[in-house]
Curated annotation (Swiss-Prot):
Domain Plastocyanin-like: 35-125
Originating organism: Synechococcus elongatus (strain ATCC 33912 / PCC 7942 / FACHB-805) (Anacystis nidulans R2)
Cofactor(s) it depends on: Cu(2+)
Membrane topology: Peripheral membrane protein
Binding site residues for Cu cation: 73, 110, 113, 118
The UniProt record lists the keyword Transcription: no
Keywords (A to Z) from UniProt: Copper, Electron transport, Membrane, Metal-binding, Signal, Thylakoid, Transport
Comment on bound cofactor: The crystal structure with reduced Cu(1+) has also been determined.
Cellular compartment(s): Cellular thylakoid membrane
Protein family: Belongs to the plastocyanin family.
Signal peptide positions on this chain: 1-34
Gene3D superfamilies: Cupredoxins - blue copper proteins
The name this protein goes by in its record: Plastocyanin
Amino acid sequence: MKVLASFARRLSLFAVAAVLCVGSFFLSAAPASAQTVAIKMGADNGMLAFEPSTIEIQAGDTVQWVNNKLAPHNVVVEGQPELSHKDLAFSPGETFEATFSEPGTYTYYCEPHRGAGMVGKIVVQ
């Protein structure tokens, strides 16, 4: 009987130690840092499109739009003037950025080329 009680006590101590070790691992894990995701304005094949046209990011991430082809381009985020960049980018490699803090789905477009289908979507988790 003493052997069984001793075994049960050791098993419970081991279980408590395991829970503490695993729990401390999760508490000490570093939070994910914010990322920057690039979107090309003007597809590599010369089409008037954002590349990629749809992205998924986390709240706090930054989107960087890079002027790629067939300038001029800009970015207007529907209903979000603070995230928009209405000035036209003329030079290849010219960039502008916006940080998305709130979860949601954001539709954006290039003002001069919206009619040609230059529209994109950002899904913020």
